[in-house]
């Protein structure tokens, strides 16, 4: 019986909408007709969808207050979007969730900054050690024997008989 009365109610609402639309269409100067039709359609859909949804939610849910609050907030947010507002209604639960998310993100960024700072300090210490090793030390006389690998090189006076052993000798070949 409830379904039958619900059907009669729906038919009467549709009839009311049709009669309203016909009276609007008779006015030739009506420029906002598509907007009015879309708003009426959305309102009717919200009306028809919200009541059964609320009934089902209240029957199946243990926390009925939260569900009702969420449904009402969703309906108002939809109406605000239709009206062109960018602001939305939020519940305390949503605000707390967003705050927890923000705090979690801030902690993550602080940990990352701490890691990066530690790495930078380690890099600075490494660069300081490299600089200390590469530091130029002034010496009075530079020993080049290590650089050219000639520790046992003799001077002309030190050679036997004063003769250079690496000079080419005259070689005669038999023909």
From Swiss-Prot:
Tree of life domain: Viruses
Subcellular location: Host rough endoplasmic reticulum membrane; Host membrane, Host caveola; Secreted
Coiled coil start-end: none
Regions that span the bilayer: 29-51
GO CC annotation terms, alphabetical: extracellular region; host caveola; host cell rough endoplasmic reticulum membrane; membrane
A GO BP entry: viral process
Membrane disposition: Single-pass type III membrane protein
Positions bearing carbohydrate: 8, 18
Positions in the Lumenal compartment: 1-28
Cytoplasmic side: 52-175
Record's comment describing the protein's domains: A disordered 28 aa C-terminal domain is presented to the cytoplasm by each subunit of the tetrameric receptor. Binds 1 calcium ion per tetramer.
Assembly description: Homotetramer. Interacts with the immature particle in the viroplasm. Interacts with host CAV1, early and late in infection. Interacts with host integrin ITGA1/ITGB1 heterodimer. Interacts with host integrin ITGA2/ITGB1 heterodimer. Interaction with microtubules blocks trafficking to the Golgi apparatus.
Name of the protein this chain belongs to: Non-structural glycoprotein 4
Species: Rotavirus A (strain RVA/Cow/United Kingdom/UK/1975/G6P7[5])
């Amino acid at each position: 019986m409830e379904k039958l009365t619900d059907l009669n109610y729906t038919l009467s609402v549709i009839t009311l909408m049709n009669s309203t639309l016909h009276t609007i269409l008779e006015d030739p100067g009506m420029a906002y007709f598509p907007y009015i039709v879309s708003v009426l359609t959305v309102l009717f859909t919200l009306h028809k969808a919200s009541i059964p949804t609320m009934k089902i939610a209240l029957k199946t849910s243990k926390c009925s207050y939260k569900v009702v609050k969420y449904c009402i907030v969703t309906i108002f947010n939809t109406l605000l979007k239709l009206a062109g507002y960018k602001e939305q209604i939020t519940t305390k639960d949503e605000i707390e969730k967003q705050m927890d998310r923000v705090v979690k993100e801030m902690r993550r960024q602080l940990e990352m900054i701490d890691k990066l700072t530690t790495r930078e300090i380690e890099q600075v210490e490494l660069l300081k050690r490299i600089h200390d090793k590469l530091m130029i030390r002034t010496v009075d006389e530079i020993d080049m024997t290590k650089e050219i690998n000639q520790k046992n090189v003799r001077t002309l006076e030190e050679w036997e008989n004063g003769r250079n052993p690496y000079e080419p000798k005259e070689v005669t070949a038999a023909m």
